[in-house]
């Protein structure tokens, strides 16, 4: 019980400053993650399946998040150039501008000091990844081709 209670409280402590920082940008952390992932690619585009694998979340969650981003004009869905079954996500100029501003704010306000040194933070990420994997939350992503 101590583990569950401690992890739950740590999650609350880590998420609260992220949510409050993203609120003025009308972004949830899930929406931010999708935008940030797309902005990191060479041309701002990535197949939906690749995005899902890299985010390590359930495909339904990514679809729901992308639906809202498309509705708000921050992401476009495009046809895959070679696979008629696949969808490509593309960040819009508005999405790129928003995620850059949100990233600056997060780096300054929420991520600057989480209370752990770099080694402890890396250890914690590895431990949590093992827990999530054993619980079936994600599998190691397959080797993926470079995004378009």
What is each model feature region?
Residues 1-25:
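N-terminal leader segment of winged-helix/HTH proteins
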Residues 8, 36-43, 103:
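Short, locally clustered residues in the helix-turn-helix/winged-helix DNA-binding domain
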Residues 31-35:
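Short alpha-helical "packing" element that flanks the helix-turn-helix/winged-helix DNA-binding module
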Residues 50-52:
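A short acidic, leucine-rich amphipathic alpha-helix
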Residues 67-126:
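Charged, amphipathic alpha-helical coiled-coil/dimerization segments
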Residues 119-148:
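C-terminal regulatory/oligomerization modules of transcriptional regulators
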